[in-house]
Amino acid sequence: MGYIPPPGDNDDNGKKSNKKTQNTSKPISSDSTPDGTTITIINPMSLIPRNPSFGLIWGPLTPASDNRPAMYTMVALQIAIGVRFFRYARTHLRRHPVPQAQFHAPPGLGVNSMISTTANQTYSAPPQQFLRRSKGDVFKSILAITTGSLLIFGSGLEIARMMLPYDPWYDEAQFYRKQAVRNGDKPNFWFGAYQYYQPMTYKEWHSKVSKWIDSVEKEIKVDETTFVIDKDGKARGGIGPAGVGYVNGAGQQSGAASAAAAVAKPLFQIRNRAKYQQIHAKLYNANETRMRELLANELNDTNVNELNKAERLDKILEGKSDLVNPNFNKPSISLGNHPMESDDEFEMVWLNFEPWDELKMETDYDIRLIPRYASVEELEQVDEGELFVVKKEELGETDNVVNESS
């Protein structure tokens, strides 16, 4: 879709000025013009995937953050390479024996035996000799140990990132992968929809994770969920007053269990924190609490029954009922009867109720500027604006229209 302005009297002047101020550099992208066709040059850097990671060394071969099987595969391969470097260093640092000629002991004696004869002669195996390590072997071993340590350390950082309940890189890659599917494209299984976005920097990632950790810490402080240590040492969750620890039969709390539970409580809550399931659980609990309050007070059997049903409906339709909130004019969102046992299922159901995205996909804007005539018109001024002669050429016919101004 494009807009081509109609030609006017200033076209020639514009062409002359464009020729004088013409830029010699070629544009990256442009559209067709009446003067000619401009070639679009694609930036080759946009064809190279730039998936972020903490410690992977694969560069453009790094898979997308939302492709967990590929990420674990590359991490395992990097760990295997690091272990191979350690084995290389161990081989070069190990003492290698010097090959010797086979020693033959007298008959009846072993190689490592030692005995004195009548001639006071002693037979024993010669001492084992080893090759001396050169400086080159030591340098290669140190370099191999350093490289292997860096590879394994980077793999550990990547595993720690993938174990986080909230990973901005994962959410970003997953969002644009789904966006590409909605637009009719098929994103790459390994690299994702890397052509749709520029991954966020490490500084932005660190800022988002820090804010998430702060919010989790605040929620943990005010959360009423308690983690109780059972007799077998396992932690279980329960709803009750703030306080942790195993209470024995005498009603006293064990000091060791209390200390262990105090340490385990924030760790369990951060590790088991879900994204969408927890949001759904909070909404469900809030709705259940509100429903019980309404049924116990405003919607009890005394106020709501079949005898006053017609009166209640009339007040609701007229907007005079106490149950009508004038500030609320938005219907509730129903998630339907779809199964929501996991985060993926809940997210799939939730994405079906995005009105702005649906409106964007269903709406097609097409703007057309319709001129007064289908062909070029020539306007001539006669007698200082009092008489206009319009010459219109359309379909091979020529008409002269004379209009007098009042």
Swiss-Prot record:
Main location (coarse class): mitochondrion
Biased composition (Polar residues): 27-36
Gene Ontology CC: one annotated term: mitochondrial inner membrane
Mitochondrial intermembrane side: 1-68, 161-406
All ranges on the Mitochondrial matrix side of the membrane: 87-137
Residue spans crossing the bilayer: 69-86, 138-160
Keywords: Membrane, Mitochondrion, Mitochondrion inner membrane, Transmembrane, Transmembrane helix
Role played: Component of the mitochondrial inner membrane i-AAA protease complex required for mitochondrial inner membrane protein turnover.
Protein name: Mitochondrial inner membrane i-AAA protease complex subunit MGR1
Organism annotation: Lodderomyces elongisporus (strain ATCC 11503 / CBS 2605 / JCM 1781 / NBRC 1676 / NRRL YB-4239) (Yeast)
Lineage: Eukaryota, Fungi, Dikarya, Ascomycota, Saccharomycotina
Gene behind this protein: MGR1
